[in-house]
Amino acid sequence: MAYLPQHIGNVLQEAAINKTALTKGMIVRMRYKRLDGKSKEYWVLILQPRWRGPTDENYLIHALNLDALPIAEFFRLVEETGVIGSKSLWKDRRLDVEKLQLDMSSRRFYNSNLKDAKVLGSAYRTYLFKNVASVRVCDYNFGTSVEDFGIED
């Protein structure tokens, strides 16, 4: 089932950013050139913005595809992790954008939240960093039930 329309309804505003400015926890809309050469737009939650393993040639973006992520599961994840303001975006661009607080390492987050969760695991994707053409960070309405833990990256 496609969950993207539900998520798009919660986006308050967007702003273009450089892909090198991506950080964990951001919700972004990105234009991505797939391996078949076709370009497509994806809305994702960034888990690891630029990762390269010891045998990898290219950097990878690890993310959750919002189109495959039910909004109830997304808000459960938000409740578990918390929300913070993005200090770097405020400092550089004066953008007041909140993101998920992903304090732990990407491996620990994957093992504790995604590995055994069928719904979250099915939304997990990797994207080649070099194939990302454009990025727009989204200010997502997390609602009033989530506590804001302050502004820090």
Language-model segments: residues:
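Short coil-to-beta transition motif at edge beta-strands of beta-rich domains
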Residues: 18-37
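Hydrophobic beta-strand residues in large extracellular and virion-surface proteins
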Residues: 25-30, 44-46, 61-63, 135
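Short regulatory "switch" loops immediately downstream of catalytic or recognition motifs
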Residues: 30-34, 49-52, 67-70, 74
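Short, solvent-exposed secondary-structure boundary/capping segments
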Residues: 52-66
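Intrinsically disordered, low-complexity, charged/polar segments
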Residues: 65-153
